[in-house]
């Protein structure tokens, strides 16, 4: 750790404090994540170290690069490439005007490329949200914190006792499914896509049941026809209110037909029928995709 000089605290992640830091030897600016684990007394589990070490192999232009893993005295530091801003802050700063459609399209396309790459290596994210999508001034967007959920679990609260958001969580997880797939990340990205377009969260639930019911009120309460097996999921209740599905043109009014078609496939109830990242990249919505540069106020 003596090779790094902390410049400033840039945030508080799910697992610990994040600092902007400088490598004293190379001058490289990095993001330093200090991982706080409940097992501080026993040290860092070897399984976590193994999982994290595998992530150093994930090299892709749309994945935030894990440069190094430093394990000292029961503490774990992850050294990542540094990016200037996250999508949440950028959307908040652009709340009045919104993001231009070509930029939304570019961001979604890049994020799907990153997902397709990770999914092809059988790595899931499980906790995608605008806060862990990082952007730079050149128009790139990258997925951060990939694979951390598998190494450390997804806590209910962060180390500062903030509630970990449910807004982007797939219905199969909310219904208690223990064995989920890459489709959970596609669901999260679908929610983020809608949020970029409408400038507000699609399903801003404040509890697991509120989260489910918000989804049901928009997409209709799922049954065996749309989602075979749903009624036998651990947390499914026959007493759930039966809501009808809303028209997508009312859910995301600014989106054209191609955009609505892609979004509805990303938000398919049945994870087996949900579009894959690879298939989504070939969707007609991306026929005219470009890479515009965002107006960042850094």
UniProtKB/Swiss-Prot annotation:
Record: residues binding ATP: 10-18, 33, 81-83, 86, 129-132, 145
Residues modified as Phosphothreonine: 14, 160
Binding-site positions, Mg(2+): 132, 145
Active site: 127 (proton acceptor)
Biological process, per Gene Ontology: cell division; cellular response to insulin stimulus; centriole replication; chromatin remodeling; DNA damage response; DNA repair; DNA synthesis involved in mitotic DNA replication; DNA-templated transcription
UniProt KW keywords: Acetylation, ATP-binding, Cell cycle, Cell division, Cytoplasm, Cytoskeleton, DNA damage, DNA repair, Endosome, Kinase, Magnesium, Meiosis, Metal-binding, Mitosis, Nucleotide-binding, Nucleus, Phosphoprotein, Serine/threonine-protein kinase, Transferase
Subcellular location: Cytoplasm, Cytoskeleton, Microtubule organizing center, Centrosome; Nucleus, Cajal body; Cytoplasm; Endosome
Function: Serine/threonine-protein kinase involved in the control of the cell cycle; essential for meiosis, but dispensable for mitosis. Phosphorylates CABLES1, CTNNB1, CDK2AP2, ERCC6, NBN, USP37, p53/TP53, NPM1, CDK7, RB1, BRCA2, MYC, NPAT, EZH2. Triggers duplication of centrosomes and DNA.
Name this protein carries in UniProt: Cyclin-dependent kinase 2
Organism: Rattus norvegicus
């Amino acid at each position: 750790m003596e090779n790094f000089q902390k410049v400033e605290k840039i945030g508080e992640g799910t697992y610990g404090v994040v600092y902007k830091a400088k490598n004293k030897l190379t001058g490289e600016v990095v993001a330093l994540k200090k991982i706080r684990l409940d097992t501080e007394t026993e040290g860092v589990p070897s399984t976590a170290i193994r999982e994290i070490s595998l992530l150093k192999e994930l090299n892709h232009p749309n994945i935030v690069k894990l440069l190094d893993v430093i394990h000292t005295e029961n503490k774990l530091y992850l050294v990542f490439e540094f990016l200037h801003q996250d999508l949440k802050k950028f959307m908040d700063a652009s709340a009045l005007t919104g993001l231009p459609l070509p930029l939304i399209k570019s961001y979604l396309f890049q994020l799907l490329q990153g997902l397709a790459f990770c999914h092809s290596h059988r790595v899931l994210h499980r906790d995608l949200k605008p806060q862990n999508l990082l952007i730079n001034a050149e128009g790139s967007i990258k997925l951060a914190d990939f694979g951390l959920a598998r190494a450390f679990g997804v806590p209910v609260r962060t180390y500062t006792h903030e509630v970990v958001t449910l807004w982007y969580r797939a219905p199969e997880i909310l219904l208690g499914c223990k064995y989920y797939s890459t489709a959970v990340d596609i669901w999260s990205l679908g929610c983020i896509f809608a949020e970029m377009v409408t400038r507000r969260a699609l399903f801003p639930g404040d509890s697991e049941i509120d989260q489910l019911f918000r989804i049901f009120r928009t997409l209709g309460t799922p049954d065996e026809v749309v989602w075979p097996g749903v009624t036998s999921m651990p947390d499914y209740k026959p007493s759930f209110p039966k809501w009808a599905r809303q028209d997508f043109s009312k859910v995301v009014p600014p989106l054209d037909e191609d955009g609505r078609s892609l979004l509805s496939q990303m938000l398919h109830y049945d994870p087996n029928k949900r579009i894959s990242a690879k298939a989504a990249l070939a969707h007609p919505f991306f026929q005219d995709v470009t890479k515009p540069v965002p107006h960042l106020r850094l």
